[in-house]
Amino acid sequence: MITATWPFFGTTGTRPTVVILAATLGIFAPGQDGFAQGCIPARHIALSLGAEGITYLEPNHWDISLSYRYLHSADIFSGYDEQPQFKAGGSNNVTTIHSFAVGLTYAFTTRLSASLFLPFTDGEGTNMHDDGKRHTMHAGGLGDIRLVGNAWLWDPARNPKGNILLSLGVKAPTGDYRATDYFYTRTGPVLRPVHVSIQPGDGGWGIVPEVQAYRQILQNAYGYLAGFYLINPRVKNGTETLRPTPGHVVINSVPDQYQGRAGLSYVVWPEQGVALSLGARIDGIPVRDLIGGGDDGFRQAGFAIYLDPGLIISRGRYTFSLSGPVALVRNEEQSVRDAKAGVRSFGGFADFLIVASISRRF
C-alpha cells in the first residue's frame, strides 16, 4: 500500500480532507490482498495508491508504507451455502494467515510515480490427516514482488475535487509456491506441499492493471472507487495438491485474482486529520482466466463480498489506517475440474478481515 498521495485542501486550511480519502482507497488490500485459493482472500495484494494518502507526492519525493492483514477461515461453503457438517464432524479446514507488505513509492512528477511492493506472509492450515487426527501445516516467507507504474489522469493542481489514478504493474514469481510440511499418513509423516491458500507465491508472472478514483460530494465528504485485476498467463505451476487423488496427480492452477471497492469517506475532525469510511468490497478468483480460460488444475474459485468500515488518521508526514471488512456474501463456485468430474466444489471463507497500514513521506 503505497502512496501516490493527495492534495491537502479543505475549509480548515490545516490538513486536507482528501488525504484521508487516499488512505481509504488503499486500505488493503492486496501484498500479496488479496486471494481466493481455498480461502478468499488468501493472498494480500495491496493497491498501489496505498492506505496512506498524504498529499500528491511532490517530484523527487518518497513514500514508504507498511501494511498488515489478518485472516482466519473456518467456515466451509459450496456455492452460496455454508456446509456446517464439516465443522461439526471436525473435518473442516482452519486457515490463519498473517500478511505484511512493505511499499515504496517514488514520484517523478506530481502525476507520475512508481511503486515497489515486498510482501511477506505467515500462514498455517489445520485439517484432518490420513491418520484420523487433526494436524497443522505451516508455510511463510517472501511473497510475489510487484513493480507498478502510476499516473494521475488529470493535473492535480487543476482538478482538486476529483481525479483518477491509473496503474499498471508486473508481478514476479518470487514467492515459494512449492512449500512443504509434514502430512501424517497411517504409516507416519511424509513431506507434501502445503495447501495452496498458504503458499507464499503462485508460481507465475502476472500483469496487474489498477484503477482508483475519488470525487468530492459534499464538504468533507468524498466518494471513492478502486480495484485491480491480476492477469496470470501461466496455467499451472507444477505443484501437486495437498491430497492428490489416488492414481491421478492434480496440479495447482495459477489463477487470476480480482478486487473491487467503493464507498464514502467523511472527515469527522478536519483539524486532527481524522476520518471514517464505509463501503463495500469484493475479493475473488474467477472460474476461467482471461488468458488460458479454464483449466483442469486445482483452483478454488469464488468470491466474497464485505461491508468495509474504516478509520483513517493523518498527522504531519504520517498516515494510519485501520479497516475491518465483515463478510456479507460468500460463494464457492464450481471449478472447471470439478464440473468435468460432476462433483461439487468446497472452499473456506473468512468471517472478517483486519487490515492496518502506516506510512511516512520523505
Residue spans for each PLM region:
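Surface-exposed strand-loop-strand hairpins of Gram-negative outer-membrane beta-barrel proteins
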Residues: 70-99, 197
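Residues that define the transmembrane beta-barrel architecture of outer-membrane proteins
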Residues: 60, 96-100, 139-145, 162, ...
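Short loop/turn motifs that connect adjacent beta-strands in outer-membrane beta-barrel proteins
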Residues: 37-40, 53-61, 73-75, 111, ...
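Outer-membrane pore/translocation modules
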Residues: 122-253
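Surface-exposed loop and membrane-interface regions of Gram-negative outer-membrane beta-barrel proteins
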Residues: 84-95, 108-146, 294
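Transmembrane beta-barrel strands of outer-membrane/channel proteins
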Residues: 64-70, 116-120, 166-172, 225-229, ...
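Outer membrane beta-barrel transmembrane domains
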Residues: 77-87, 235-362
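Residues on the lipid-exposed face of transmembrane beta-strands in outer-membrane beta-barrel proteins
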Residues: 54, 66-68, 102-106, 116, ...
